[in-house]
Amino acid sequence: MKVLKGSFRDACDVYGFIKYNPARDLRLPRFDKRREDIKHLYTQKEIDLILNKFSNNDTFTCVFLTSCYTGMRTGEVCGLTWDDIDFEKETINIQHNVYDKPKDGKGRWYIGTTKTETGTRKIHLSQTLKIALQNYKKKQDYFKKIYGKRYIYYNVEDVKNQSGKVVEHRIVREELSNKDSEKINLIFTRENGLYLGTDITRTPFKIIHNELGIKKCRFYDLRGSYAIKILNNGVEIRDVADLLGHKNIETT
């Protein structure tokens, strides 16, 4: 593409062989590898099988249900805090995305804004998910009392570059964080409060692949399955795009 555009530019602007450069506004189409992948569309039977298998794993069950009923991205689900959930108004405020970097002594999980500007959105909290999250919160509060001082809490601290500009926000255990850091009420943690970020789905999906025999499925595929489900229920494509945080319906 660079050679083609350069040749036409020289022919037009340098040598005057042509009056108009036909390659001036030429752009290669964006290639999104993930969109090229064959997605797995979960059946209700598979979802029921998975939920039954992990009925004793409250954290993964709630993570799985959250994606099933919202179509949120993996990093968005794992970045949810209790401050994002409004049980009274039955809404979820999606405003964070979690990602990892090589561990540097303080932690490897970072929290930022959503993937795109339209990714920041407020969606409805269904009754099924509401009840699941309320029950999960009760258990989490119970374990906080049981573990007492041994329970792990987290803060978010600013990461600055050499010029002193804040460039990222790192999730750090409370006892390791800076004085000016702020507490974060992460939802999906181990019973002792340990935060695993998106790794919370890793071991369960090995079991799903190897023991349940649902091959090649990914946690991310719940997003597409949710979109197909609500489309089949009559939701307009523009509304589906908004729920998923897509700017363009072509992405959806």
Predicted regions and their residues:
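C-terminal catalytic core of tyrosine-transesterase DNA break-rejoin enzymes
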Residues: 65, 69, 75-76, 199-211, ...
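C-terminal catalytic core of Y-nucleophile DNA break-rejoin enzymes
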Residues: 91-93, 102-103, 111-138, 149-171, ...
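Exposed loop/turn and edge beta-strand positions of beta-sandwich/beta-sheet ligand-binding modules
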Residues: 60, 119, 182, 213-216, ...
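Hydrophobic recognition helices of helix-based DNA-binding modules
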Residues: 7-12, 133-136, 230, 234
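Conserved catalytic core of the tyrosine transesterase superfamily
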Residues: 55-65
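DNA breakage-rejoining catalytic core of tyrosine-based enzymes
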Residues: 18-20, 24, 30-52, 95, ...
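N-terminal DNA-binding recognition helix of tyrosine site-specific recombinases/integrases
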Residues: 1-25, 73
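Conserved hydrophobic/aromatic pocket- or pore-lining residues that grip, position, or stack substrates
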Residues: 4-7, 26, 50, 66, ...
